[in-house]
């Protein structure tokens, strides 16, 4: 049953995710940012859920490159592709850090929590430290743990249907407005 309080693109996305089943692509999204040198940067991150009606939640390490990128330019784009429905969603918006992230930390497994205490992303691994990837328990919230809130301004959906592809654009002003556009 459709949730009338959600934007219509959320219904389409929910349908795509349901058809995708337990595939990793159901949670893996591609996040594009712009570096301090004004160069594009792209990486795969994990979709962690929704904040309010139309903001995505992403976890990251405070020491990662993307934190610097987002501080200098909060504009970002997320691409989410579903193979079974041949649907490509492009989300444009701004990313900000959520200051109240304790509840999200509490949802993580001990294995996941341990990873926030490992070495900095992109640094050479110190093999002399045996406990570098040790799984610990009862860990306090790491200062490296960051919850990002991706506030979506527009959604571009391309359905690779045959014989004709379909494309829709939603833009948020006071409310979400949907327009069918040429693929």
Feature map (PLM): residue ranges:
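A short mixed-secondary-structure module that forms the rim of ligand-binding clefts
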Residues: 48-86
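Charged, gly/pro-rich active-site loop segments
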Residues: 2-4, 87-183
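Short acidic, glycine-rich loop/turn motifs
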Residues: 33-37, 80-84, 159-162, 172
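A short, aromatic/hydrophobic, helix- or strand-capping loop or linear motif
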Residues: 24-25, 81-82, 118-120
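An N-terminal domain-cap segment
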Residues: 1-53, 68-69
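Short beta-strand or tight-loop elements
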Residues: 27-29, 43, 74, 143-146, ...
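Structured loops at beta-to-helix junctions and adjacent beta-edge loops in soluble globular domains
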Residues: 34, 61, 81, 94, ...
């Amino acid at each position: 049953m459709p949730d009338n309080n959600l934007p219509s693109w959320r219904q389409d996305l929910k349908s795509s995710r349901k058809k995708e089943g337990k595939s990793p692509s159901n949670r893996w999204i591609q996040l594009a940012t712009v570096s301090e040198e004004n160069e594009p940067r792209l990486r795969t991150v994990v979709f962690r859920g929704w904040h309010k009606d139309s903001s995505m939640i992403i976890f990251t390490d405070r020491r990662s490159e993307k934190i610097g990128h987002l501080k200098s330019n909060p504009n970002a784009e997320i691409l989410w592709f579903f193979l079974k429905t041949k649907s490509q969603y492009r989300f444009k918006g701004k990313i900000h850090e959520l200051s109240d992230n304790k509840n999200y930390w509490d949802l993580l497994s001990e294995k996941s929590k341990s990873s926030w205490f490992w070495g900095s992303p992109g640094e050479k691994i110190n093999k002399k430290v045996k406990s570098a990837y040790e799984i610990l328990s009862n860990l306090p919230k790491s200062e490296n743990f960051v919850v990002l809130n991706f506030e979506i301004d527009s959604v571009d959906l391309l359905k690779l249907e045959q014989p004709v592809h379909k494309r829709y654009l939603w833009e948020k002003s006071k409310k979400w407005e949907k327009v069918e556009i040429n693929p």
